[in-house]
């Protein structure tokens, strides 16, 4: 009976939110998901809602059958941006690598892929199938990957040498596959002063013709007394971002204008 009622409501144009089956029953979705989906429905008719693709999390590549190399990223920033943009009515597609956290509600369009080559292939596919109007590159992509050894490298060896090869840069390939779009990059550095950080962000904008770059330092991420990040646009204007909530709001304002 419930299925028939839900089907009838859907056919009449109602938006029905159904949770996954748990313990043999379909229970009420969490309040967080209900609010998120309602916000998306309410805001999707606002002007300048966009199709947005975002990469997030870290890459991982094998050293041997049991060991691997990865970049530092929990995925917190990428998930937070994705959730915020979805609630604001945008159509969001996430390409997620390895993350320590998951979104607070089920985002409708998520692909998980951890290896840098596979992530790039997925992003290129999405460039044609989803045709993003905006790309946000927040993933910590491996710049180098090892040539994996067959089996397990013996732990009795006193030292090992690992040969690493450079990976293909994701941003130019993805933007070339997408065509005209608004693009935001991320630049994470460590033990560097602000002037040098902004110089590196500016170089990234010039190299890839990005519209803006979010620059931050590893040592600032968990320091409540430090800014969360700085944003630099293609005109050279920079500004401080106090926290993650502000970061999400600033990105949305750039996209929606």
Residue ranges and their predicted role:
Residues 14, 90-91, 179:
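Short phosphate-binding/catalytic loops that engage adenosine nucleotides
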Residues 114-187, 194-217:
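Glycine-rich phosphate-binding loop
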Residues 70-84, 153-173, 207-211, 240-254:
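Gly/Ser/Thr-rich active-site loops/lids in small-molecule metabolic enzymes
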Residues 15-50, 218-257:
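Glycine-rich phosphate/pyrophosphate-binding loop and the adjoining helix
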Residues 1-23, 27-38, 182-212:
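Short, glycine-/small-residue-rich phosphate/pyrophosphate-handling segment
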Residues 7, 49-115:
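Glycine-rich phosphate/diphosphate-binding loop of Rossmann-like nucleotide-binding domains
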């Amino acid at each position: 009976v419930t299925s028939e009622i839900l089907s009838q409501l859907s056919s009449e144009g109602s938006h029905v939110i159904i949770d996954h089956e748990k313990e043999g029953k379909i229970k009420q979705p969490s309040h967080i998901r209900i609010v998120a989906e309602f916000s998306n429905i309410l805001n999707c008719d606002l002007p300048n809602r966009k199709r947005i693709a975002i990469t997030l999390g870290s890459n991982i590549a094998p050293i041997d059958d049991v060991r691997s190399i990865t970049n530092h990223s929990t995925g917190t920033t990428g998930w937070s941006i994705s959730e915020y943009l979805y609630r604001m009515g945008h159509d969001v597609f996430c390409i997620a690598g390895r993350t320590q956290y998951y979104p607070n509600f089920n985002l409708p369009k998520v692909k998980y892929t951890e290896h840098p080559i596979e992530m790039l292939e997925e992003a290129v596919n999405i460039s044609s199938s989803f045709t993003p109007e905006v790309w946000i590159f927040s993933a910590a992509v491996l710049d180098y990957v090892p040539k994996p050894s067959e089996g397990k490298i013996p732990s009795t060896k006193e030292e090992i040498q690992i040969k690493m090869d450079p990976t293909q840069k994701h941003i130019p390939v993805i933007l070339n596959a997408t065509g005209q779009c608004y693009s935001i990059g991320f630049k994470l550095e460590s033990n560097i002063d602000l002037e040098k950080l902004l110089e590196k962000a500016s170089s990234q904008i010039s190299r890839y013709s990005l519209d803006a770059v979010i620059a931050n330092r590893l040592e600032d991420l968990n320091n409540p007394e430090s800014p969360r990040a700085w944003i630099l646009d293609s005109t050279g204007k920079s500004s401080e971002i106090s926290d993650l909530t502000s970061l999400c709001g600033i990105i949305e304002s750039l996209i929606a204008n």
